[in-house]
């Protein structure tokens, strides 16, 4: 058994209504999505936003031991596929989003929040098929949104199949909001993309890139067909670059859509039901442990994957 430092526990209320606990396990490969406030085009592709986001991503990934596999920065949201090697994903996302928000406020002369008030969508990718599909999904997102005809046409930050595990971004420190005298903010940082560890072992690098390329081609075809059926006109890279950051996306989107916590990929019915059962068991064990903890039993054992209660209150979890 182990327990973590209670830290700021005495300042945190634990009787307020809680969202579902997030399952955080070391070595998990996940897809992260977060939107801008009211879908403003605050991340419109331009050199300054590119530099800010990549620099911050590189610094935070290095600090928290996160492996970056894929990234697409749309004008209204981010997509990341990463592996949480050290079980620090919540810390990583908190720092990344705070720094990106502060920098964006400076660049865009923006008052108020930059990110949507909903917490980040974090989808655990439980199978090799799921990782391949979500890597391709992240790449195809600009096509699905009707912004460009092909993933390779996106003028903002993106990663293509042939760049997986190969590309290294070298980013100079943005001017204006990172203290050059603070060693936390080096003059230059490198962000080297890695291959998802389990897939590199089972597929091999070249076969994995080919599998993602095939899946990307499939998703691009479906996206182009959907854009055509909706009667949309593809905006194009040049018009994307000219979007006002203060303009909002106008395409229909439900206010409260589904927010899945895991993905298994197509044709994985058995794995899906197993994952549902495991998630329900985790949440049930968490609720039962929380009730006992609130009743004063500080020695109660929380289920493996408990993160926030470990961090804030030092609860006991299995080793």
What function would you assign to each model-found segment?
Residues 1-319:
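Short catalytic/metal-binding and nucleic-acid-binding patches
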């Amino acid at each position: 058994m182990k327990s973590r430092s209670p830290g700021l526990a005495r300042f945190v209320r634990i009787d307020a209504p809680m969202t579902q606990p997030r399952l955080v396990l070391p070595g998990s490969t996940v897809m992260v999505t977060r939107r801008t406030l009211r879908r403003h085009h605050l991340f419109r592709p331009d050199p300054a936003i590119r530099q800010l986001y990549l620099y911050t991503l590189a610094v935070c990934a290095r600090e928290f031991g996160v492996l970056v596999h894929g990234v697409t920065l749309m004008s209204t949201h981010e997509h990341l596929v990463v592996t949480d090697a050290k079980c620090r994903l919540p810390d990583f996302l908190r720092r990344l989003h705070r720094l990106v928000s502060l920098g964006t406020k400076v660049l865009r002369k923006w008052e108020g929040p930059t990110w949507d008030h909903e917490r980040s969508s974090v989808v655990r990718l439980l199978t090799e098929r799921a990782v391949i599909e979500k890597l391709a999904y992240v790449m195809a997102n600009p096509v699905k949104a009707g912004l460009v005809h092909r993933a390779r046409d996106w003028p903002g930050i993106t990663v293509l199949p042939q760049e997986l595990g190969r590309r290294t971004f070298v980013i100079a420190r943005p001017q204006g909001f990172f203290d050059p005298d603070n060693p936390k903010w080096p003059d230059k940082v490198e962000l080297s993309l890695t291959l998802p560890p389990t897939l590199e072992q089972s597929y091999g690098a070249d076969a994995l890139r080919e599998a993602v390329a095939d899946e990307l081609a499939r998703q691009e075809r479906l996206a182009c067909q959907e854009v055509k059926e909706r009667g949309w006109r593809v905006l194009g890279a040049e018009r994307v670059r000219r979007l006002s950051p203060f303009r909002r996306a106008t395409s229909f989107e439900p206010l409260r859509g589904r927010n899945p916590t895991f993905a298994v990929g197509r044709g994985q019915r058995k794995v899906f039901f197993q994952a549902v059962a495991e998630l329900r068991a985790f949440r049930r064990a968490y609720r039962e442990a929380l009730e006992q903890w609130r009743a004063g039993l500080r020695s109660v054992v929380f289920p493996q994957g408990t993160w926030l209660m470990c961090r804030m209150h030092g609860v006991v979890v299995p080793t």
